[in-house]
Curated annotation (Swiss-Prot):
It holds the Pfam family Bet_v_1. Keywords: Allergen, Pathogenesis-related protein, Plant defense. Belongs to the BetVI family. One of its GO terms (biological process) is abscisic acid-activated signaling pathway. One of its GO terms (cellular component) is nucleus. This is Major strawberry allergen Fra a 1-B. The keyword RNA-binding does not apply. It comes from the Eukaryota. Monomer. GO terms for molecular function: abscisic acid binding; protein phosphatase inhibitor activity; signaling receptor activity. The keyword Transmembrane does not apply.
């Protein structure tokens, strides 16, 4: 088994606490509302929403995939960190066992947020991850993030 790690960093004008509430804590409600073509629904299969929880994410009509399951490892509301693994679903393909994700939102000096993400692809055997697969995932995540950011700018009184 190989492990391929990819890191990404980008910024937002939205303050970290507000962004964390929308992007992590309420994503299961917010994303289907603002991007139903991407995510149809999210449901908790096991747990209470905290560490150890298993969630099923059903993709919308505009997606190439049907569903994935996430296992939450940690949610730190004070330090704005979140980690989970994609453990099941057609987005994994035959060559990937799981994908670990870590997200950290850091308050930026200008009042916005620096978003740091790490993705670790755990492959089956000696399979290498194709760069275009990672790039496509980053582009979808970036688009979804921009939708959330736009929603927060259009609704400044929410998630305070």
């Amino acid at each position: 088994m190989g492990v391929y790690t990819y890191e990404n960093e980008f910024t937002s004008d939205i303050p970290a606490p507000k962004l964390f509430k929308a992007f992590v804590l309420d994503a299961d409600n917010l994303i289907p509302k603002i991007a139903p073509q991407a995510i149809k629904c999210a449901e908790i299969l096991e747990g209470d929403g905290g560490p150890g929880t298993i969630k099923k994410i059903t993709f919308g009509e505009g997606s190439h995939y049907g569903y994935v399951k996430h296992k939450i490892h940690s949610i730190d509301k004070e330090n704005h960190t979140y980690s989970y693994s994609l453990i099941e679903g057609d987005a994994l393909s035959d060559n990937i066992e799981k994908i670990d994700y870590e997200t950290k939102l850091v308050s930026a000096p200008h009042g916005g947020t620096i978003i740091k993400t790490t993705s670790k692809y755990h492959t089956k055997g000696d399979v290498e991850i194709k760069e275009e697969h990672v790039k496509a995932g980053k582009e979808k995540a970036s688009h979804l993030f921009k939708l959330i950011e736009g929603y927060l700018k259009d609704h400044p009184s929410e998630y305070n």
